[in-house]
Amino acid sequence: MTDEIYEHILFDGAKYINMASILGMQDQNITINSISKTYSLTGWRVGWAIASVKLTGSIRKVHDFLTVGAAHPLQEGAIAALRSDLPYYPTLAAEYRERRDFLRQVLEEVGFRVYHPRGAYYIMTDVGHMDFKDDVECAFYLVEKIGVATVPGSCFYSRPELGRTKVRFAFPKKMETLRLAAGKLRKFKPNKKKG
């Protein structure tokens, strides 16, 4: 199963490869996608699954128990979005790349160790060199003392201990919002971890 919701939000020459396009995977893969991220319509909850006939029967059974269908106007809106001109995608990626580059520079300036993302709209950082017990303590400090919300990195690991030194920032905001966050982050003076 592959979640391909960020297929159009790529940077620095990164290429999207659909898992089902790989030889031998077409009948084994379930591709999940939606209009949420690419079209900034997260509240609509319109998505889809693409799979072989042998898998779709089971998907439909599970779907029937978990949700009802999306409202018709939302389905029509999704169709209009999906039929929109292709120049939308490069423009979207360029706008997010600008935000990524801006936030990355600020985070590095402040002292975060940044993992350079080539897709999506998040930046994972390492804070293991800072004087925090773990990612949760750092995230609470940032929101309570600095006024910038992050997500503890351990949330994204099947073995949470592997993410205890990481926090994730998101940049799908207006530039003015990111500039305000940058001003707050520049007041952050992290202590270095002792020993």
Model-derived regions, located:
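PLP-dependent class I/II
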Residues: 1-195
